[in-house]
Amino acid sequence: MATTPDTSVSALARYEPVIGLEVHVQLLTASKIFCSCSTRFGDPPNSNVCPVCLGLPGALPVLNRKAVEFAVLAAMAINCRINQTSIFARKNYFYPDLPKGYQISQYDKPLAEHGWIQIPVGSGTKKIGITRLHLEEDAGKSLHEGFPDSQEKTAIDLNRSGVPLIEIVSEPDIASPEEAYEYLTRLKEIILYTGVSDVNMEEGSLRCDANVSVRPRGQKEFGTKTEVKNVNSFRFIREALEYEIDRQIGVVESGGKITQETRLYNPNEGKTYGMRSKEEAHDYRYFPEPDLLPLVVDENWQQEIRKILPELPEARRERMIAEYGITPQDAQVLTTSKSLADQFEAAAKAAKNPKRVANLVQGELMGRLKAKGLEIEQSPISMKGVAFSADLTESGAISSKMLKDLYDLSFERGKDFPAVYDEEGRPQQSSDTSALEKIIDQVIAANSKEAEQYRAGKKTVIGFFVGQVMKLSKGQANPQLVNQLLAKKLDS
């Protein structure tokens, strides 16, 4: 949790934040962007390198076609205009894990521009503009700790050098840490649906830098911005922005000036710290990459890529609401991942009542998966099993209590619901009126005090009686029928 500076509520109300995000997404190609080396994560250090990765003299880059297609697909998914011609450029700076002394990126002629993402804000929505999406290569990785002989050494792993990235730069349209969180959540969903990246933040497949400034409410001019780096989760991004906004307001309120700089976020302390002065574009001395021709993505190639653009989360939500009659809230939860949405639709198509399937997937199934740390693909209960269980409860064959117990057994035994249902002797909810009346008479006789309370007007006591009947029937009594019979007996 961010440790916010002591800024008064009135001061916070007088200022508004202006936020823009730069998101780097690692593309899920088998080989690097300018050579054939593997992009596999977790291999031994410096095992996936070649003269191109190492920046050796005479090594020439060859552009990976699949990386271009993935980048175009992502750009289309966030509503960008694809530039038919874009140019690679050298971004010059020194860092130990950048062996060439420059990074091949794109500058004034990027692959795509002028996109947008729609996010929920309050009871409505808001469009966040996308300035640009461009292709570039990743740098290597500096490892600063874990050396037994000295803590002052840094090791360099160049396996990541040359891995293909797209950088997605938003317009400064984001007005709060909450909006930043929603933007990143929606962007991650969209990228996952396209399949161009696994957006795994722990492995560095998605990285985010935040540019933030504050200004008096109503002012058009931007304030001086800072860039916050080293933020490796969406929650930390929100916390870092909350702290930095409060810090900047405090500086301005006390008569100081904001320094344009790069700051690091320390999640343990919940604070940002100055790292270095913020570079401007001219500091990188961009110039066109002489070893690569301009990238041409003509209309025919764009149309080929557009054909493989999948149904995206927002469109899928709208279709599922219309097709299955589920609520917008259900649709939102069920489309958070493409895999979950696919699984739900498979079950919904096989069941009589898709709404019941939605409730079971979100409640009984996802709750147990989360408790055991499992993904939907690891569920012992298949979507056919969910559909089967939904139909059993829909028909009244089993009660919700029986369903919960059978789901528990499925997870304990690692078996699908139909198999466990068979093993348990295909239990049925009891709707035998005469048998239930005998149990009800027994329960009322044993609890005369509660019966008098009911007759005196305390109608909620009926829940106690239902529980007792369900207990004696070992959960197999039809609770709706039990309610009816109890009310009739107690009212007589």
Region annotations inferred by a language model:
Residues 2-311, 322, 328, 349-353, ...:
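Basic, nucleic-acid-interacting segments
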Residues 13, 325, 348-357, 397-398, ...:
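Structural motif
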Residues 28, 246, 341, 362-370, ...:
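Amphipathic alpha-helical core segments of compact helical bundles
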Residues 203-216, 321-344, 354-372, 390, ...:
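Core structural elements
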Residues 301-308, 315, 345-350, 386-398:
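Extended, non-catalytic structural segments that build the interaction scaffolds
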Residues 330, 343, 353-361, 385, ...:
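Residue-level detector of well-ordered alpha-helical segments, enriched
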Residues 377-387, 397-471:
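Strongly charged, low-complexity linkers/loops
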Residues 473-479:
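Short, basic interhelical loop/turn and adjoining N-cap
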